[in-house]
Design a protein with these regions (language model features):
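Compact nucleic-acid interaction/catalytic patches
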Residues: 20-23, 29-62
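C-terminal terminal-subdomain/extension
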Residues: 63-112
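Coiled-coil-like amphipathic alpha-helices with heptad-repeat character
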Residues: 18-20, 68
Length: 112
């Protein structure tokens, strides 16, 4: 079990839509929500036509990295229990963390 922190990229199991299995995928840790639950955001390597997607590349990391250029999708928030966090991949630079948080706030305030 991993102890996450704000700004971390972690691997967690994302279930298939039919719930028969799950695949490990990266997620960005946004905030602690209490009782070992964390608010996270989806990360993908697919450049969706998502106007809010934020590109993350190797130079955006303080430590660690992803295998390829990826995209944080700030409109895809979810809560996950610490018990499902499998591995910490790295930490994003403070400036990138601030950019992602600002985007989440803008999405919430705009009502999108």
């Amino acid at each position: 079990m991993v102890t996450p922190s704000v700004g971390a990229i972690v691997l967690i199991p994302f279930p298939f839509s039919d719930l028969t299995n799950a695949k490990l995928r990266p997620a960005f840790v946004v905030a602690e929500s209490g009782k070992d639950d964390w608010v996270c955001v989806q990360i993908t390597s697919n450049p969706y036509a998502d106007a809010e997607a934020i590109k993350i590349k190797e130079s955006d990391f303080k430590t660690g990295s992803l295998q390829r250029v990826s995209y944080v999708r700030p409109g895809k928030l979810f809560t996950a229990g610490r018990i499902i966090f499998k591995r910490k991949i790295g930490m994003l630079a403070d400036s990138k963390v601030d950019e992602i948080k600002e985007s989440i706030i803008n999405i919430i305030q705009s009502g999108k």
